[in-house]
């Protein structure tokens, strides 16, 4: 072995002990509330169709797969957990490894710990309040600020993301020094998201967590469209100290609508020169069988612990980051 090989953990033992304590506290938070802990597969024959998510892919060649079987490491346990909900599990949570074939850096590692939970009969606001309770307990922070996506844009960019045209979006991007990128982007949603990333995110959640809710309906993903305003989806995200912590929905229960969204994602992927992804027929069958009205959220545990310990980067709270894996 080379003398320069970095065999040591990327996190200190002291931080790993604190990490274990935080994870135990998170488990207690849910068990004390009667939420069932579950385990679901780390691999699946289907994967996400989201244009901006990149799953790891492998090949199963063992007995029972003579011609080989393509499997994907899960970017989130969402699809399997919804199948449990459809089977009558009641409220559930999971702490698990998730995998995304994306960047590695201060706030990213391709293998990370996800906390995901689902609450039957909760609307989006009730789940947001529960997320806020968890953050206050783990981070010892103030109660979060709650603002709509529209309010966030009006406050920080002085434009309405629900009605602004592409010319105005490019003008706003120019003011942020993003004109060269914006002029090459023709997709309105991508322009809106770019402005949110560079013009809104850095300005929210500085002193206390910020919940941004009612994302544009075109960014609904697996969320229901609001019955009060069809321009927006029942979707929220959570930000604190420059970090995106969580992404939640009032979950879409209509199997036909979900199929249409998956197919639309694949059309967008094709337009960008990306491979089209296999649609999860098992999830759609579960939705057709009957997913209870529910809300769910995915939260990045490593990022949560990083904030709790006031660490500089994820590798300070992960035993072995990808560079030392």
Curated annotation (Swiss-Prot):
PROSITE patterns: AA_TRNA_LIGASE_II. InterPro entries: Aa-tRNA-synt_II (IPR004364), aa-tRNA-synth_II (IPR006195), aa-tRNA-synth_II/BPL/LPL (IPR045864), EpmA (IPR004525), Lys-tRNA-synth_II_C (IPR018149). ATP binds at residues 100-102, 109, 244-245, 300. GO terms for biological process: lysyl-tRNA aminoacylation. Its EC number is 6.3.2.-. It is an enzyme of class 6 (ligase). Keywords: ATP-binding, Ligase, Nucleotide-binding. One of its GO terms (molecular function) is ATP binding. One of its GO terms (cellular component) is cytosol. Substrate binds at residues 76-78, 118, 251. It catalyses: D-beta-lysine + L-lysyl-[protein] + ATP = N(6)-((3R)-3,6-diaminohexanoyl)-L-lysyl-[protein] + AMP + diphosphate + H(+). Belongs to the class-II aminoacyl-tRNA synthetase family. EpmA subfamily. With EpmB is involved in the beta-lysylation step of the post-translational modification of translation elongation factor P (EF-P). Catalyzes the ATP-dependent activation of (R)-beta-lysine produced by EpmB, forming a lysyl-adenylate, from which the beta-lysyl moiety is then transferred to the epsilon-amino group of a conserved specific lysine residue in EF-P. Homodimer. This is Elongation factor P--(R)-beta-lysine ligase. It comes from Pectobacterium atrosepticum (strain SCRI 1043 / ATCC BAA-672).
